[in-house]
Design a protein with these regions (language model features):
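Bacterial N-terminal signal peptides
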Residues: 8-18
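Sec/Tat signal peptide C-region and signal peptidase I cleavage site
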Residues: 20-24
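Sequence context surrounding c-type heme c attachment/ligation sites in exported
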Residues: 25-50, 54-61, 67, 80-162
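Sequence-specific dsDNA recognition surfaces
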Residues: 67, 71-77
Length: 162
């Protein structure tokens, strides 16, 4: 009888440890929709520079105004999975665009967009920001210029998986 209890206990602990291991691999707690906390999240807590490029936009590619002459587009796992499935971006999706000058070396700005459920339903629930290369906040929040330009696209996204 003790053997049955021991086997049951070992099985329970194994399932418990596997479940906790899976939980640890999930995205870190999502950031607030405010400039400073979001910057900390994408540069320290869950650095976007370790993320993959958005599908079809690997490496540097030509850009246009108001962004840089050349761009790099990073996306978190949530955004990449939705893009590959052909779905709209879900809550927690983050895209980070590095904006470069004509020489392809001078980083001019970092312009992320973050889907935060309930943040701005009229603006697709996107939080927008523009940071200087040093992380200084140039604009953030419900940015009219971003919303006006992007609203003509499905889910406010110009970048579609290729």
């Amino acid at each position: 009888m003790k053997k049955v209890y021991l086997i049951g206990f070992i099985m329970f602990m194994g399932i418990f440890l596997i479940f906790n291991g899976l939980q640890a691999g999930q995205d870190k707690e999502m950031p607030p929709a405010e400039a400073e906390g979001f910057w900390t999240y994408i540069t320290e807590t869950n650095s976007y520079e370790k993320w993959d490029f958005f599908p079809g936009y690997e490496g540097m590619y030509p850009g246009k105004s108001p962004h840089g002459a050349y761009l790099k587009l990073y996306a978190n796992d949530t955004a990449i999975q939705a893009a590959k499935a052909g779905e709209q971006m879900p809550d927690g999706a983050i895209l980070v665009k590095e904006n470069y000058g004509k020489n392809k070396e001078d980083l001019m700005a970092i312009t992320p967009m973050y889907k935060k459920k309930g943040y701005n339903p009229d603006g697709g629930d996107w939080f927008w920001a523009k940071y200087g290369p040093d992380g200084s906040v140039e604009t953030s929040g419900k940015v009219d210029g971003c919303i006006q330009c992007h609203q003509v696209q499905d889910d406010f996204l110009f970048s579609k998986p290729k």
